[in-house]
Amino acid sequence: LPDRKRLEVARALATRPKLLLLDEVMAGLRPTETDEMVAVFKSLNQETGITILLIEHVMRAVMSLSHHVTVLHHGEKISEGTPEHISQDPAVLDCYLGEEEDV
């Protein structure tokens, strides 16, 4: 992982919080670095029981780390549920993949 990201995470964990708020922590990372970061947070959650609140656009990371997901579009909640539910919700698919057009 890039050193700056490691430092940011270490600084946040120094006080041994019960809740870790991560805001776009995957931004600017390559896919392999994102995978490393996901593994770090999964391990951290399992070993310490820390709650992680993730604000993120990298959906692969969101789906991998989350037990519960809330999806916002222009500040409005459009869906909420498990990653499995979110990945199949027509409202989410329409917002992020575009609506099907009649051909």
Named regions from a protein language model:
Residues 1-103:
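Glycine-rich phosphate-binding loops of nucleotide-dependent enzymes
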